[in-house]
């Protein structure tokens, strides 16, 4: 939500988790090098969105480089396949450039507690987390944008609309919008799993979920890719939609600015995970983004206790939601249990969407480490 007088300068990194233990070795040397040799070149705000592509094309042609992504709807600029040192040299004196930001890693943000396999099938289960926030309710006619690892496009318990979707991956095994990890499908299930007698039911059952794939099969991605996903949502979402971001990394001004701009332009609500490092959420992005349509969510357990892993701090945290031992969907059918602010954010996303940005609350998180107990969202 709207937060003022907040200066952020501390840098940190979202660590890999044991839920997706392979995150720690994501990418290997080859992809690490690709990220290290990508620079986000931001143009000045007065550059017209209609001129961005032409300017980017001309710049990379002269530098004998390539633009991996071009941003024209939120921030303006591009991600180019060279280090920022080389980019600064190549584009020295270009009056359209505001600044250069090195690309970096972004992760899905489940907690360090290991996920447990669930059952699934018949009969349908209503997760405790859904009940705790006042669900399920009928979400037919509503839309949630899941900015994540993709969604299982053929899942029988989801209403997926891939026609409006996006993938930051244009080639290789991660191309397309299908979920190669399971994280995005779990998130989508919490928001809107169908009330159809199987698996689980979501908070806003039957909500149309749109995959915006910015994380790969190992639950990892890049700032440049996430920016591209947010840029897509900015011009495709409608007022009252919800965009969920259960991901994060170190503090990144470009992403915060993009999320704030996308929320302002589209009229959608952006709901983001606070993160799982037991630190102040002001240190990480997009949790530290500030806008009256951006909501940062901490996590609680089934006894309304503040989750030991959850980031904290008011601002930027706005509300808490259930995030420990959360049952939801897995790829291919059935269910699985995960923990994290990744699981809290989609529950809040559904509530905020159904309440048009004015969620009710029911109780507060006990043992909040910042001493200012977060209110728990409720329909």
Protein language model annotation of sequence segments:
Residues 23-36, 44-49, 53-124:
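Autoinhibitory propeptides
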Residues 1-22:
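Gram-negative bacterial Sec-dependent N-terminal signal peptides
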Residues 40-42, 79, 99-101, 143-147, ...:
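Structural recognition of the beta-strand scaffold that forms the well-ordered cores
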Residues 30, 68-72, 201-204, 211, ...:
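C-terminal subdomain of the subtilisin-like protease fold in secreted/lumenal serine endopeptidases
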Residues 134-164, 175-225, 238-241, 289-293, ...:
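Subtilisin-like serine protease catalytic core
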Residues 109-114, 200-201, 220-226, 245-318, ...:
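Substrate-binding/specificity loop regions of serine endopeptidase catalytic domains
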Residues 22-33, 83-89, 112-146, 151, ...:
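N-terminal domain-start motif of subtilase-like serine proteases
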Residues 93-99, 157, 267, 291-296:
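Glycine-centered tight turns that cap/initiate beta-strands
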């Amino acid at each position: 939500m709207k937060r003022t007088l907040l200066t952020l300068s501390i840098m940190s990194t979202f660590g890999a988790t044991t839920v997706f233990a392979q995150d720690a070795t994501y990418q290997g040397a080859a992809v690490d090098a690709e990220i290290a040799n990508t620079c986000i070149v931001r143009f000045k705000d007065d550059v017209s969105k209609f001129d961005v592509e032409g300017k980017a094309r001309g710049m990379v042609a002269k530098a004998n480089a390539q633009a991996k992504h071009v941003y024209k709807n939120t921030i303006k600029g591009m991600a180019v396949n060279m280090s920022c040192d080389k980019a600064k040299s190549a584009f020295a004196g270009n009056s359209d450039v505001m600044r250069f930001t090195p690309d970096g890693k972004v992760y899905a943000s489940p907690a360090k507690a290991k996920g447990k396999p669930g059952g699934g099938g018949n009969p349908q289960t209503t997760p405790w987390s859904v009940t705790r926030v006042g669900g399920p309710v009928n979400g037919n006619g509503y839309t949630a944008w899941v900015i994540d690892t993709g969604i299982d496009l053929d899942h029988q318990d989801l209403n997926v609309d891939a026609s409006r979707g996006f993938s930051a991956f244009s080639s290789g095994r991660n191309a397309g919008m299908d979920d190669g990890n399971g994280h995005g499908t779990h998130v989508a299930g919490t928001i809107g799993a169908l009330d159809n007698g199987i698996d689980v039911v979501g908070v806003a059952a039957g909500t149309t979920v749109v995959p915006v794939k910015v994380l790969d099969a190992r639950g990892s991605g890049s700032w440049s890719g996430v920016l591209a996903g947010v840029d897509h949502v900015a011009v495709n979402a409608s007022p009252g939609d919800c965009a969920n971001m259960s991901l994060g990394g170190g503090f990144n001004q470009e992403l915060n600015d993009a999320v704030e701009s996308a929320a302002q332009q589209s009229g959608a609500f952006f709901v983001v995970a606070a993160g799982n490092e037991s630190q102040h959420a002001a240190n990480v992005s997009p949790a530290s983004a500030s806008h009256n349509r951006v909501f940062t969510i901490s996590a609680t357990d089934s006894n309304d206790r503040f989750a030991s892993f959850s980031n904290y701090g008011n601002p930027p945290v706005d509300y808490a939601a259930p995030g420990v031992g959360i049952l939801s969907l897995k790829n291919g059918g059935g269910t699985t249990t995960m923990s994290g602010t990744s699981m809290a954010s989609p529950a809040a996303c559904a509530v905020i969407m159904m309440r048009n940005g004015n969620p009710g609350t029911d109780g507060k998180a006990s043992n909040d480490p910042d001493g200012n107990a977060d209110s728990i969202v409720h329909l």
